[in-house]
Amino acid sequence: MLNNMSNNTNNITSVLTESLPYIKKFQGKTIVIKYGGNAMVDEALKSSFARDIVLMKLVGMNPIVVHGGGPQIGKTLKKIGKQSQFIDGMRVTDSETMDVVEMVLGGLVNKEIVNLIHQHGGHSIGLTGKDGSLISAKKLKHDIEPTSEIIDLGHVGEVDKIDISVINLLLKGDFIPVIAPIGVGKDGFSYNINADLVASAIAQALNAEKLILLTNASGLLDANGELLTRLDDNIIDGLIKDGTIHSGMLPKINCALSAVKNGVKSTHIIDGRVAHAVLLEVFTNSGVGTLITCNE
């Protein structure tokens, strides 16, 4: 028993010692975290994520959370008897579905995250991209390969412009912003936007130190299924050309590349199924995912 206690103490001491240089390095820096996947549905992972965010704030960082909520939207639609339809992984969003999206993302999911942060001693404010004109959106025009036929996805949008005024106001007040990826267009309509795209755009607008994307994978894997721990844009271009990066991971990689090519120091694609994944990635030498930087 004494040996076990000694080993545990040594492990804790090692982690704390290892984290100190990173705490100093990133004090006062802005880190945008896209929160999604298993980390949003597993109770233990939800709690560990909230604690990670609170600790980052306590040691002087400025974490900003952008969240998804696809499974929760699907569950609510099913309850009201409405079928979910997807094209190339994107939810077809008519006006009725958009009402549900706003209710679930802007209400249920957003406020649950805010409440979890509060439970662990943090101070956060939840908002959507419609608040303070944070996210100006435009309708997404999606074409299907190989015909290039333009498909109307309804209220599915992309980021047109980010106004960081409301975020800066919250950071100045020492709050943790928790943002639902809903924007408003010049036409006055609400649009549901992919949370990875929103997180990347906000990170770029703020010149953030880091963009962290939580996934249901270990990170970016090579052709043999081995984790690629560190990549730059040149290597990634090659991996896309040879087909190593494909399908569902490709849009996420494009978000990561867009960020590091436009002022964000680094992007991290990490395994949200690992407890305290955010802290392990930011505060340890080995991390728990793939670090992406720009070679320019």
From Swiss-Prot:
Protein residues bound to substrate: 69-70, 91, 192
Metal-binding in keyword set: no
Enzyme class label: transferase
Listed pathway(s): Amino-acid biosynthesis; L-arginine biosynthesis; N(2)-acetyl-L-ornithine from L-glutamate: step 2/4
Protein name in the entry: Acetylglutamate kinase
InterPro entries registered for this protein in UniProt: AceGlu_kinase-like_sf, AcgluKinase_fam, ArgB, Asp/Glu/Uridylate_kinase, Glu/AcGlu_kinase, NAGK-C
Highest rank taxon of the organism: Bacteria
Keywords, ordered alphabetically: Amino-acid biosynthesis, Arginine biosynthesis, ATP-binding, Cytoplasm, Kinase, Nucleotide-binding, Transferase
Cited function: Catalyzes the ATP-dependent phosphorylation of N-acetyl-L-glutamate.
Catalytic reaction annotation: N-acetyl-L-glutamate + ATP = N-acetyl-L-glutamyl 5-phosphate + ADP
